[in-house]
A protein has these predicted regions:
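Surface-exposed amphipathic alpha-helices with a cationic face
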Residues: 111-114, 181-190, 237-242
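Active-site-proximal helices and loops of the catalytic beta/alpha 8
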Residues: 140, 158, 212-214, 218-243
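Hydrophobic faces of well-ordered beta-strands that scaffold small-molecule active sites
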Residues: 80-82, 121-123, 194-196, 225-227
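Catalytic domains of carbohydrate-active enzymes, especially glycoside hydrolases
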Residues: 108-127, 219
Length: 243
């Protein structure tokens, strides 16, 4: 069905877990910017090509993890914050982490943080960003060589991305939703809050940015956000009742 030029499709199924999808717009295969997960992005540092084996996943709303879960009441003035990069931090943890580079690996660091007195962690971008985008030259244009190296990895993730999806390369399993929620539950169980960094470049739609933060707050129980970039409306975020 549609309203004007806006089309919508309703899928009636007991479970959408087994299905994946993409869009094809003017002959070009593209991913849904509102996708809740991506299949085909499990390996970090691999160039992102939207037309090759990358598909969107539906949200698995049947995941468990919130039984008896209570968010820690960490006041700002009493916060002892540990900022980290999911992959880099757990890769360097050596003997302390068996699931290196992953959200699950972070849960193994909880005893260490408690020993330090940490009551909040801040994750550098952990949504699905493209660390090695493929820049295809436009048809009919000459390829101009520059000094920019090809396939340079954006290790830190401060770029646009799929803001509703946990980064699958940071997961030890094929269940990103379950693993991220498990991490949040374990943090909260031990009195540690989780804050996420989001980078919204200037071209980002402000309403989309708001919806993304609301989703992570509601579905993943993230405790707060450190928002960067120019692609969001500060007043809109400050006035929002969910955040």
């Amino acid at each position: 069905f549609h309203t004007g030029r806006v089309w919508a499709l309703k899928l009636c199924s007991a479970s959408l877990k087994e299905f994946e999808y993409n869009y094809k717009i003017d002959g070009e295969i593209v991913q849904d910017p509102y996708a809740y997960g991506l299949h085909g992005r499990e390996h970090f540092g691999v160039p992102y090509d939207p037309e090759k084996e990358v598909r969107c996943r539906f949200l698995n709303e049947n995941v468990s993890g919130w039984e008896n879960e209570t968010a820690p009441a960490v006041e700002y003035e009493n916060m002892i914050l540990y900022k980290l990069h999911v992959r880099g931090y757990t890769k360097l943890a050596r003997k302390m982490v068996s699931h290196k580079g992953t959200f699950l690996g972070l849960t193994e660091m909880i005893p260490y943080w408690k020993e330090l007195g940490i009551n909040a962690i801040e994750l550098m971008p952990a949504y699905e960003f493209c660390e090695v985008p493929i820049n295809k030259p436009k048809e009919g244009s000459e390829h101009i060589k520059t000094r920019r190296k090809e396939n340079v990895v954006n290790y830190w993730g401060y770029a646009s991305g799929f803001y509703f999806s946990p980064k699958s390369a940071y997961c030890s399993t094929r269940e990103p939703e379950q693993e991220f929620r498990y991490m949040i539950r374990e943090l909260h169980k031990n009195g540690i809050a989780c804050i996420m960094e989001f980078y919204f470049p200037e071209e980002t739609d402000s309403l989309m940015a708001l919806r993304a933060l609301q989703f992570w707050r509601d579905f993943y129980h993230v405790d707060g956000f450190h928002v960067l970039g120019e692609g969001f409306n500060r007043e809109m975020l400050l006035r929002d009742g969910i955040l």
